[in-house]
């Protein structure tokens, strides 16, 4: 029996389609993005990237670049303060400062093609580019690792020599596997032995880039008073603040991040690449503001994509079409440093199904590719690809309807997720019923042209909403309009979706709201726009602020 729930429909603001508050500035070109930032005395930065996939840095000669007219400063990793193993928030995950420092600028080794090895600040872009090309680097080429099989081989070259891997709680050195974890409950082997059909398959996937339109950029000023001001295209200004401060070894209170519009992120703009480099070059250049804009080829070559890898999936069912057991190995590429989305993949992979016995083993594996990053429900698409492929094969083998099979095995309230968490209410059954009853599923496919294939598919997938902290301030003006300050980067019109929730409480049109996103000194901490959290979490902050405003107006 599928539970039904009543949903309130008599909203005056929520559920409508107003004109976005940021729409006019964006369609007329007046909106300010990171690449548009202009401040007095601005100079330009550029970086030298490694042409090699895996190599040891034997020496760097920057003298020719430093001697050029128009060059203010040259930077290598030795200019960074020593970073510890501490971690700071980077939106949908955390950043290890020691690893992140050598990711944004290599120290003793390069771990992927495009890895930054040096940077310059110069009077203009052309001079900066010319200076970068004068820097000489001596490399010792090393054998590259391009996939998880090579990385896990006994004789594999080691990418990160000081890595201490966590393999099911055991500390392991001389390894490319940063972490192995396992979630298991029920008697998995016994359940497979009692199954009427067992199918085991392995799927592989490549790293995929988010493909946002606007490239990474940052402008930074390290002023004489020790304070740093940053402008950066980011999904979270406070993440830029914490990472920049941590990498430079200064208090977060010394870093102010100004909000600029963001031209797409999809999870790929939660990490910093340029802000700390720009700040250090600014200090070495006498406090001049330094600006970086990444070129398109470097965006694809050296910024964080979604992880590729390999997933082994084994599923058992009985003759009635009920899943009896599942066992999966998730082997995802973290890139040149630890931290793939394998943890999230382990949560998502079996979450859509009510399975009495399961085993999930995850592997976070280093390869000579750019450090991976989030991309639209990080880890879930890879996991869904693996399990849904096998589910479809099971249905084909048993001659079962693919929606009905998913309904018969759907996770519901009380189902235990693969990592042990027990679900509260979830709407998967309602979604599947709606799909089964829709014209999209039941309409005829029509004639198939010669040489073509025409079909219709169904798949289930899972993602969890992020939580975290958000801040929203509301100020009622004398004319009845409302000034709204909130800390979430606007992706997809979140200014408006947040304002709509407050407007619903206040009983006024959302057009009477004037939303803005202040700098990090002028609004309370707010987490990243990512992890499916913003409309809910920042919206809840706006809702609570509106409730308090109503109470004050009544007094």
Model-derived segments and spans:
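Intrinsic disorder at enzyme termini
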Residues: 1-29, 417, 432-449, 473-477, ...
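Flexible, low-hydrophobicity surface segments
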Residues: 1-172, 198-201
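Glycine-rich loop/linker segments at domain edges
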Residues: 16, 21-28, 92-100, 170-218, ...
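Flexible hinge/switch segments at interdomain interfaces of large molecular machines
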Residues: 34-43, 213-216, 358-369, 469, ...
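Alpha-helical support elements that line or immediately flank enzyme active sites
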Residues: 47-81, 118-139, 217-285, 342-347, ...
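Short, surface-exposed loop/turn segments at secondary-structure boundaries that line and modulate
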Residues: 75-115, 150-163, 239, 257-277, ...
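Phosphate/diphosphate-binding loops
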Residues: 116, 123-124, 285-336, 540-555
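Helix-loop-helix junctions that connect adjacent transmembrane helices in secondary transporters/permeases
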Residues: 158-248, 410-481, 500
């Amino acid at each position: 029996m599928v539970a039904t729930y009543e949903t309130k429909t008599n909203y005056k603001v929520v559920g409508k389609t107003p004109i976005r508050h940021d729409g006019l500035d964006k369609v007329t070109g007046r909106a300010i993005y990171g690449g548009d930032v202009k401040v007095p005395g601005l100079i330009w930065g550029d970086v030298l990237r490694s042409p090699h996939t895996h190599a040891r840095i034997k020496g760097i000669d920057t003298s020719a670049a430093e001697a050029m007219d128009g060059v203010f400063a040259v930077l290598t990793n030795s200019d960074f303060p020593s970073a510890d193993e501490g971690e700071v928030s980077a939106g949908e995950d955390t950043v290890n400062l020691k690893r992140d420092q050598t990711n944004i600028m290599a120290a003793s080794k390069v771990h992927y093609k495009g890895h930054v090895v040096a940077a310059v600040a110069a009077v203009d872009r052309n001079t900066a580019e010319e200076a970068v090309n004068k820097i000489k680097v001596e490399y010792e080429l090393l054998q590259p690792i391009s996939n998880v099989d090579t990385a896990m081989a006994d004789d594999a070259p080691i990418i990160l020599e000081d890595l201490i891997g966590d393999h099911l709680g055991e500390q392991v050195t001389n390894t490319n596997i940063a972490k192995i974890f396992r979630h298991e409950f029920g008697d998995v082997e016994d359940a497979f032995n009692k199954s009427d059909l067992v199918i085991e398959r392995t799927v592989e996937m490549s790293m995929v880039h988010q493909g946002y339109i606007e490239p990474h950029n940052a402008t930074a000023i390290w002023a004489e008073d020790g304070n740093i001001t940053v402008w950066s295209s980011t999904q979270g200004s406070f993440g830029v603040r914490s990472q920049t401060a941590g990498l430079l070894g200064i208090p977060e209170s010394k870093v102010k991040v100004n909000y600029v519009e963001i031209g797409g992120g999809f999870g790929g703009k939660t990490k910093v690449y340029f802000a700390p480099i720009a700040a250090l070059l600014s200090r070495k250049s006498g406090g001049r503001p330094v600006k970086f804009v990444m070129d398109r080829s470097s965006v694809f070559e050296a910024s964080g994509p979604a992880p590729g890898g390999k997933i082994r999936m084994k599923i058992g069912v009985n003759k009635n079409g009920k899943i009896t057991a599942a066992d999966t190995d998730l082997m995802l590429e973290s890139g040149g440093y630890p931290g793939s989305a394998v943890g999230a993949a382990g949560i998502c992979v079996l979450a859509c199904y009510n399975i009495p016995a399961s085993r999930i083993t995850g592997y976070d594996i280093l390869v000579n590719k750019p450090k991976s990053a989030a991309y639209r429900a990080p880890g879930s698409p890879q996991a869904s690809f693996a399990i849904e492929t096998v589910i479809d094969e099971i249905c084909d083998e048993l001659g079962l309807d693919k929606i009905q099979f998913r309904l018969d095995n759907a996770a519901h309230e009380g189902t235990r997720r693969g990592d042990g968490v027990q679900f509260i209410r979830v709407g998967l059954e309602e979604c599947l019923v709606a799909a089964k009853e829709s014209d999209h599923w039941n309409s005829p496919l029509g004639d198939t042209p010669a040489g073509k294939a025409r079909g219709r598919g169904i798949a289930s997938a899972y993602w969890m909403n992020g939580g975290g902290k958000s801040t929203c301030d509301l100020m009622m003006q004398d004319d009845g309009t409302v000034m709204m300050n909130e800390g979430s980067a606007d992706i997809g019109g979140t200014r408006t979706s947040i304002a709509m929730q407050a407007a619903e409480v206040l009983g006024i049109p959302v057009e009477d709201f004037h939303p803005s996103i202040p700098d990090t000194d002028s609004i309370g901490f707010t987490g990243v726009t990512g992890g499916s959290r913003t409309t809910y979490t920042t919206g809840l902050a706006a809702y609570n602020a509106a409730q308090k405003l109503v109470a004050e107006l009544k007094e």
